[in-house]
Amino acid sequence: MRLSIKAPAKINLSLDVLYKRPDGYHEVKMVMTTIDLADRIELVALPEEDAIRIVSQNRFVPDDCRNLAYQAAKLLKETFSIRQGVAISITKHIPVAAGLAGGSSNAAATLRGLNKLWQLGLTLDELAELGAKIGSDVAFCVYGGTALATGRGEIITPIPSPPPCWVVLAKPPIGVSTAEVYRNLELERVSHPDVDAMVRAIERQDYAAICRLVGNVLEEVTLKKYPEVAHIKEQMKRFGADAVLMSGSGPTVFGLIEHDSRMQRVYNGLRGFCDQVFAVRMLGERHSLD
């Protein structure tokens, strides 16, 4: 049996870090939404063997236990004593190490797909609980749509989708270590976004307020260390984006744009100096088990 599943990227419309917890994780409060930039995950059952095989044409995708999709398959096999293998083919469209949860989305898609392939009968809530053991963003990626994420990111409260608009993304040719960004974050010196106000703006579909309220506390670290990220932000604003923000720990920057003509201007302007530029829409729907 063979299954093909989309694994969409996410952006953070608002990201706040509240404090460092005794368990070493950071308590966060953030609004995330999925966008129409997605990897493709293909699962092929291997009933005659017990292996997990990762295949990808992208040389930056690990084919062993470092891969979150591999970890998702291994977790299901061990939890439910599955005695058959699976080949996981990953076609990458989401940039790697970009702050867009590409690896987490691959893991979430693998959980959803293997739930069907192996006929486990798990609910999305049960899959999200398993996903949280793999990574903080995996639980959100199991559900998709738009949500308020709290705890270390694994406590998911769905909220309505934002009003439709274009999302233009640009990633500079650098990688950013999420762990290093958190290590260098000085919470007493940063400006904290109003996440609750963002939720209310989304609930009343107030595009102008959403644009005013975007905020990411991690910018305080990444923009200082990587001036190319700050440069992309400046250029995106100059070209006319309605709101501009770094996603996650970076380095990808996104702009929200309401009108087609302005989106084209921003997209074309960024293509002049940045190789990885995308123009996509937000995804309104949460994932289903069908």
Swiss-Prot record:
Gene Ontology MF annotations: 4-(cytidine 5'-diphospho)-2-C-methyl-D-erythritol kinase activity; ATP binding
Pathway the protein takes part in: Isoprenoid biosynthesis; isopentenyl diphosphate biosynthesis via DXP pathway; isopentenyl diphosphate from 1-deoxy-D-xylulose 5-phosphate: step 3/6
Keyword field contains Acyltransferase: no
Enzyme class: transferase
The keyword ATP-binding belongs to this UniProt entry's keyword annotation: yes
InterPro entries: GHMP_kinase_C_dom, GHMP_kinase_C_sf, GHMP_kinase_N_dom, IspE, Ribosomal_Su5_D2-typ_SF, Ribsml_uS5_D2-typ_fold_subgr
Residues annotated for ATP binding in this entry: P95, V96, A97, A98, G99, L100, A101, G102, G103, S104, S105
HAMAP family in the record: IspE
Protein family according to the UniProt entry: Belongs to the GHMP kinase family. IspE subfamily.
Function of the protein: Catalyzes the phosphorylation of the position 2 hydroxy group of 4-diphosphocytidyl-2C-methyl-D-erythritol.
Protein name listed in UniProt: 4-diphosphocytidyl-2-C-methyl-D-erythritol kinase
Source organism per UniProt: Geobacillus kaustophilus (strain HTA426)
